[in-house]
A protein has these predicted regions:
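Surface-exposed assembly/interface segments
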Residues: 1-225
């Protein structure tokens, strides 16, 4: 779900089974939606298709992500994992609180360095943890230029049978592993933030395998389904 200038008037989404289809519809390779889709479709196993939604400006010209999610829900329920181009923590917080009441999961990322400070509670991971939110799942990326890393994560595990994996200990195609100190590793885990790093010689998504509020992800997915 992102801001873009594609689709027809009043058209809020389209389904795609490849990025080639998106290029045919006018998307370019530097757009958020394309990059997110490319990360998703690059994984193995690969998802069959995705819903690409559109965030439309409100009458005053502002963008309200919760309203955008509601509008998307009003026209299609053929999605479960929500990924957005929201940047501000306030938007991420609002999305997470709304999705908590829905049959869906919100997967987000952040490069806020405060997440690496064990004493800091103002980063988005700490905020969602404090609210005990069970339908949100977060990923920390040190490199601020990386667009939608969570899409690779969702793409890798979304098609798996619930309970067959913990959403960690696997490589994610299109992402570059980052280095973390043991202290940073521990801090991120304590905040239920996941991260892409090296374990020995292998690139791997690591973390607590918990949702924002602290419960195991596979438990939450099992309860929802």
């Amino acid at each position: 779900l992102s801001k873009h200038a594609h689709f027809g008037t009043n058209e809020l989404y389209r389904k795609y089974s490849s990025t080639t289809e998106m290029l045919s519809d006018g998307f370019i390779t530097t757009e958020y939606a394309y990059i997110a889709a490319q990360r998703i479709f690059s994984q193995n196993p690969q998802v069959r298709d995705i819903v690409v939604g559109k965030v439309v400006a409100e009458q005053d010209g502002s963008f309200n992500y919760v309203n955008a999610v509601k509008k998307l829900q009003s026209v299609t329920n053929e999605w479960f994992f929500l990924i957005t181009d929201a940047v501000d923590d306030a938007d991420k917080l609002a999305i997470a609180q709304y999705i908590e009441t829905q049959t869906a999961m919100y997967v987000y990322s952040s490069s806020d360095v405060k997440a690496l400070d064990s004493a800091d509670t103002t980063d988005i991971f700490s905020k969602l943890k404090a609210l005990n939110l069970m339908h949100s799942l977060g990923m920390f990326v040190r490199d601020t230029t990386v667009v939608s890393p969570e899409s690779a994560w969702v793409g890798r595990f979304a098609s798996a049978v619930i309970g067959s994996n913990a959403w960690i200990h696997k490589a994610l195609t299109t992402l570059v592993a980052e280095s973390f100190t043991r202290t940073e590793w521990s801090t991120l885990q304590s905040k239920n933030a996941h991260f892409y790093t090296k374990v020995g010689q292998d690139d791997s998504i690591e973390g607590s395998a918990n949702v924002a509020g602290g419960e195991k992800l596979h438990v939450i997915l099992g309860a929802i389904w």
